[in-house]
């Protein structure tokens, strides 16, 4: 899940990315911030539930229980998503190796909770 300026439009990207022998593959769903603000004008000032359901067949990304992207992992060469992984929560600032604008700092990245379920 990423926040990007896509042209002049602030957007949320729900991405899956994998590599096969150096060939990078993406499944991206781009939703403008206006899409969410049209549902709730105060949307960007609230906490939201981001969810990843990862089964033997699919990976699905949800925002506030709305499905925003999914892939069938059985269709991916090498079964990259059938290995063990770890969770990484970070605030990546900058883009393509560029230094972030110091005038935008400091920033706050608040996470209320993390839940992990495993079958």
Give residue ranges: language-model regions.
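GH16 jelly-roll
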Residues: 1-119
